[in-house]
């Protein structure tokens, strides 16, 4: 094995020289230069600095403006809540441990950080599944006269949390475990060892099939059908131009969220799967650290997508920030009006975020 396994940790360095120490008790500066830990701490501080205000603003603006409280937005707000969980439960912990060069908060801190990081990522993924199904049902109309309403949105919220907890909670109760990974200052699922009594192999296979592959297959199926339906509707001119435009804007926004999720999480998932299927192979601490910390940036991309692609949300946000006045009122007004009109013409979910 090209690493050192100990109680609740795996350090990617063979302990031939005797310098490997527990990441819960000693700085891990023998793995990489101390400056790298300072850089990770600064990166986490940046994510907190951006992630908290932008997600809090998303929640506040939606609560403040009644016209944004649509069933579809319940799912989008769910993402903001999950991102805030990641910021407070995960990012603050990782920033603190990076500044010390090891997981100074011990096993409890590792469980907290690993749990919130996994929970946030899974809520994001299953929220995208619910959004994809909603888009498919609204645009493709496999169920005639179906209208996505408040009850459906609440059921969707409950579903995302149930599925996310089904992935994040088992390592807390003995099915697999959370251990420090990479440079040993952030925690994740144990892909690295076959530790006796934890059944890591069965959990990792379960997680990759039920909580990664199947959700992505559902998303790809829904959007494959959706793109075909949009082209057919445009060719047949079955709906008004205003409704079609609103449908396209919502669909484009959600597709961008799916792409952003894949960009953030696919490298981490790929590296984790490689480590799991090549246990004992030689790899450095940075090999897992870079994709793991890159995945954490997912907490800021969803609200940025709302702001960039959703004119109605952007209009409400500017109004809130400018104390009830929008200096770009004339420019934004027409777009907002068209969105409101589209919302009344089509399904209640047509008006995005």
Curated annotation (Swiss-Prot):
Motif 'Ionic lock' involved in activated form stabilization boundaries: 134-136
Disordered as annotated region, ranges? 331-353
Pfam families, per database record: 7tm_1, Rhodopsin_N
**Chain intervals with Low complexity compositional bias:** 334-353
Location, primary (coarse class): membrane
According to the record, the segments passing through the membrane are 37-61, 74-96, 111-133, 153-173, 203-224, 253-274, 287-308
- Glycans attached where? 2, 15, 200
**Biological-process GO terms, alphabetical:** absorption of visible light; G protein-coupled opsin signaling pathway; visual perception
Q: Does the keyword Transferase apply?
A: no
Protein's cellular compartments: Membrane; Cell projection, Cilium, Photoreceptor outer segment
Protein keywords: Cell projection, Chromophore, Disulfide bond, G-protein coupled receptor, Glycoprotein, Lipoprotein, Membrane, Palmitate, Phosphoprotein, Photoreceptor protein, Receptor, Retinal protein, Sensory transduction, Transducer, Transmembrane, Transmembrane helix, Vision
Q: Where is this site: Plays an important role in the conformation switch to the active conformation?
A: 113
Q: Which InterPro entries match?
A: GPCR_opsins, GPCR_Rhodpsn, GPCR_Rhodpsn_7TM, Opsin, Retinal_BS, Rhodopsin, Rhodopsin_N
**Cellular component, GO annotation:** membrane; photoreceptor disc membrane; plasma membrane
Please give the sites of covalent lipid attachment annotated as S-palmitoyl cysteine: 322-323
Positions in the Cytoplasmic compartment:
62-73, 134-152, 225-252, 309-353
List S-S links within the chain: 110-187
Extracellular-facing ranges? 1-36, 97-110, 174-202, 275-286
What Gene Ontology molecular-function terms does this entry list? 11-cis retinal binding; G protein-coupled photoreceptor activity
- Membrane topology per the record? Multi-pass membrane protein
Q: Write out the function statement from the record.
A: Photoreceptor required for image-forming vision at low light intensity. While most salt water fish species use retinal as chromophore, most freshwater fish use 3-dehydroretinal, or a mixture of retinal and 3-dehydroretinal. Light-induced isomerization of 11-cis to all-trans retinal triggers a conformational change that activates signaling via G-proteins. Subsequent receptor phosphorylation mediates displacement of the bound G-protein alpha subunit by arrestin and terminates signaling.
Q: Which family does it belong to?
A: Belongs to the G-protein coupled receptor 1 family. Opsin subfamily.
Question: Which PANTHER family does its entry note?
Answer: OPSIN
**Can you say what this protein is called?**
Rhodopsin
Protein's organism: Diplodus vulgaris (Common two-banded seabream)
The gene name reads rho
């Amino acid at each position: 094995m090209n690493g050192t396994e100990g109680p609740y940790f795996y350090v990617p360095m063979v302990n031939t020289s005797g310098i490997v120490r527990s990441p819960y008790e000693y700085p891990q500066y023998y793995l990489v230069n101390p400056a790298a830990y300072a850089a990770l701490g600064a990166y986490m501080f940046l994510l907190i600095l951006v992630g908290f205000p932008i997600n809090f603003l998303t929640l506040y603006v939606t609560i403040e403006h009644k016209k944004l409280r649509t069933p579809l937005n319940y799912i989008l707000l769910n993402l903001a809540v999950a991102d805030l969980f990641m910021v407070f439960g995960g990012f603050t912990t990782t920033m603190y441990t990076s500044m010390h060069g090891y997981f100074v908060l011990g096993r409890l801190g590792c469980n907290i950080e690993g749990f919130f990081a996994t929970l946030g990522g899974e809520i994001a993924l299953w929220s995208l599944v619910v959004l994809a199904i909603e888009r498919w049902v609204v645009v493709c109309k496999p169920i005639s006269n179906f209208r996505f309403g408040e009850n459906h949105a609440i059921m969707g919220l409950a579903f995302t949390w149930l599925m996310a907890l089904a992935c994040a909670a088992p390592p807390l109760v003995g099915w697999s475990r959370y251990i420090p990974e990479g440079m040993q200052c952030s925690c994740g699922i144990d892909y690295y060892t076959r530790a006796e009594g934890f059944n890591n192999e069965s959990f990792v296979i379960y997680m990759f099939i039920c909580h990664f592959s199947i959700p992505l297959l559902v998303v790809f199926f829904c959007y494959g059908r959706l793109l075909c339906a949009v082209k057919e509707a445009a060719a047949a001119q079955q709906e008004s131009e205003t409704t079609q435009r609103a449908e396209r804007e919502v669909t484009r926004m959600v597709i961008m969220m799916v792409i952003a999720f894949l960009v953030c999480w696919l490298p981490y998932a790929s590296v984790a799967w490689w480590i799991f299927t090549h246990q004992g192979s030689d790899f450095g601490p940075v090999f897992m650290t870079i994709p793991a910390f890159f995945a954490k940036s997912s907490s800021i991309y969803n609200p940025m997508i709302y702001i960039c692609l959703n004119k109605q949300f952007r209009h409400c946000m500017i109004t809130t920030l400018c104390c009830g006045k929008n200096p770009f009122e004339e420019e934004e007004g027409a777009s907002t009006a068209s969105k409101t009109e589209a919302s009344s013409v089509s399904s209640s979910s047509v008006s995005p975020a």
